[in-house]
């Protein structure tokens, strides 16, 4: 028992000794560990403080300037709108197995990509079939354009006058010749010619003229629509009798003008179109809006119904597809718009196609314009009994009135009405007119560019008021913008009566009636 106790005591002593020794060793080992933990804790505390300071700096830092916000917002709007349905070649859509992919250089024609920023979205929907047919036409343009192999083959046949001579290209052409220097009529006529080319699967070639390339961007990717200057018949375009009686089966000449003879009007008859099917080159001289007459050709009717389920949208969609202002003209448009029209809540266009003739008639027309505008809530009423609007009815809504007229007097009178008198509800009204010149009389160089800019600005209006005497310029404007204008009624005995104006039934150009053709069918 004593041995056992002794052993036990020894063991206890050993254990105690070991414990003390282990404790010492453990303490020795723990010292550096505690030091490391303190260091890590300090680092963690520093990181936490740094994190808090960074968060505070993010919260309390100065907000970005308004300019940055506006720039970023404008960029987002632009990117968003560029993907909207603003025209066939700007968007990327898929129709069946057909991809419509942009293939233009943006910088060469900014208006093609920026138009939706200045004009409100069209209330009309373009048919998917029109998208499809335009894409097919662009394919035709790439295959049959000037100086392509197909073009050269067809040109060789024209020179030889032999239909059976050499390889067949499969390309047919319609050459549009302008017979009217007026810009508006040129655009109406050219849109009509393009629809004819679309319906007959012909390549449209456009006579260059003195200013066409200065006014309009190329509408089709990769290939020009302008007739090459070296085209062999260029020198004979004014010799109509020579073209009619050339005896060359490869070319036909047709003259479509408002004063066409009965024989020339037969162009819109089915039999005439059948005869032209085998003719590779058709020279078409036109001076007016003949698009409505194409709806009378029986073989075109079904195709037109598919292209334009709403018949009166034809010019609207075709003009937006074809007519893109060049960068020079686009600069005129955007600078004016941004300076005078952009900040307004509403933009009202007024086209006055009547020259100033006598004080009494002049004042009657001013009164009628104002009466029309106020009756239909386009223009605000003025309070001639007060110097300032009542603070009880203060309305800060702004309206910009854009006046297009060759006579400065109308602009000055309407401007003075809103300058000299407060509006009843306190609206802010600004009245603008870009120029006093008559563009119609000098359709070239800068005057044509300004005329095109003015047409475009009118098309950007939210509402449009026009005099009863129509102009091709305003017809293009409301057709391009998809607007049904308010048309002033003709005054009786120089005095206007109710109704002062009526809203047009269509957005299409309508002052030029469909050509009566007298076809047997």
UniProtKB/Swiss-Prot annotation:
Pfam families tied to this protein: XG_FTase
Q: Which GO terms describe its molecular function?
A: galactoside 2-alpha-L-fucosyltransferase activity
Where is it expressed, tissue-wise?
Expressed in roots, stems, leaves, flowers, siliques and seedlings.
Query: Which stretches does UniProt call biased (Basic and acidic residues)?
Result: 1-12
Q: Does the keyword Transferase apply?
A: yes
Q: Which keywords, in A-to-Z order, does the entry hold?
A: Cell wall biogenesis/degradation, Glycoprotein, Glycosyltransferase, Golgi apparatus, Membrane, Signal-anchor, Transferase, Transmembrane, Transmembrane helix
Family to which this protein belongs: Belongs to the glycosyltransferase 37 family.
Functional description taken from the UniProt entry: May be involved in cell wall biosynthesis. May act as a fucosyltransferase.
Q: What is this protein called?
A: Fucosyltransferase 3
């Amino acid at each position: 028992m004593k041995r056992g106790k002794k052993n036990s005591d020894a063991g206890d002593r050993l254990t105690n000794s070991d414990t003390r020794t282990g404790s010492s060793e453990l303490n020795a080992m723990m010292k550096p560990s505690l030091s490391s933990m303190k260091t890590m804790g300090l680092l963690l505390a520093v990181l936490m403080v740094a994190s808090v300071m960074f968060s505070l700096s993010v919260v309390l830092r100065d907000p970005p300037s308004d300019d940055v916000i506006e720039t970023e917002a404008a960029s987002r709007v632009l990117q968003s709108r560029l993907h909207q349905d603003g025209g066939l070649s700007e968007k990327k859509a898929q129709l069946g197995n057909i991809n419509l992919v942009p293939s233009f250089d943006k910088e060469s024609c900014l208006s093609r990509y920026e138009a939706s920023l200045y004009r409100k979205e069209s209330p009309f929907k373009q048919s998917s079939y029109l998208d499809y047919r335009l894409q097919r036409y662009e394919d035709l343009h790439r295959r049959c354009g000037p100086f392509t192999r197909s073009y050269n083959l067809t040109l060789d046949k024209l020179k030889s006058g032999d239909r059976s001579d050499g390889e067949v290209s499969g390309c047919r052409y319609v050459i549009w010749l302008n017979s009217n220097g007026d810009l508006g009529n040129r655009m109406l006529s050219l849109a009509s010619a393009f629809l004819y080319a679309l319906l007959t699967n012909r390549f449209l070639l456009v006579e260059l003229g003195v200013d066409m390339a200065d006014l309009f961007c190329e509408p089709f990717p990769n290939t020009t629509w302008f007739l090459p200057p070296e085209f062999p018949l260029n020198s004979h375009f004014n010799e109509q009798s020579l073209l009619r009686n050339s005896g060359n089966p490869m070319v036909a000449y047709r003259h479509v003008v408002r004063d066409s003879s009965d024989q020339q009007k037969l162009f819109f008859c089915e039999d005439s179109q059948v005869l032209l099917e085998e003719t590779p080159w058709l020279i078409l001289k036109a001076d007016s809006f003949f698009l409505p007459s194409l709806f009378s050709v029986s073989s075109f009717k079904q195709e037109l119904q598919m292209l334009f389920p709403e018949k009166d949208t034809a010019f609207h969609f075709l003009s937006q597809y074809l007519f893109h202002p060049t960068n020079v003209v686009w600069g005129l448009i955007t600078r004016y718009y941004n300076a005078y029209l952009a900040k307004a809540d509403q933009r009202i266009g007024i086209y006055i196609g009547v020259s100033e003739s006598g004080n009494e008639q002049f004042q009657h027309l001013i009164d009628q314009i104002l009466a029309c505008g106020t009756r239909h809530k386009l223009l605000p009423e003025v309070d001639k009994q007060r110097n300032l609007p009542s603070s009880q009815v203060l309305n800060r809504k702004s309206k910009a009135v854009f006046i297009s007229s060759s006579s400065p007097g109308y602009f000055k009178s309407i401007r003075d009405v809103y300058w000299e008198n407060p509006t009843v509800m306190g609206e802010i009204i600004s009245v603008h007119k870009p120029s006093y010149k008559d563009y119609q009389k000098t359709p070239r160089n800068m005057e044509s560019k300004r005329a095109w800019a003015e047409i475009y600005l009118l098309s950007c209006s939210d509402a449009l008021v026009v005099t009863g005497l129509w102009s091709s310029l305003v017809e293009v404007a409301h057709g391009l913008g998809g607007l049904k204008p308010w048309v002033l009624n003709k005054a009786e005995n120089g005095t206007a009566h109710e109704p002062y104006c009526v809203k047009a039934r269509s957005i299409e150009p309508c002052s030029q009636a469909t050509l009566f053709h007298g076809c047997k069918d």
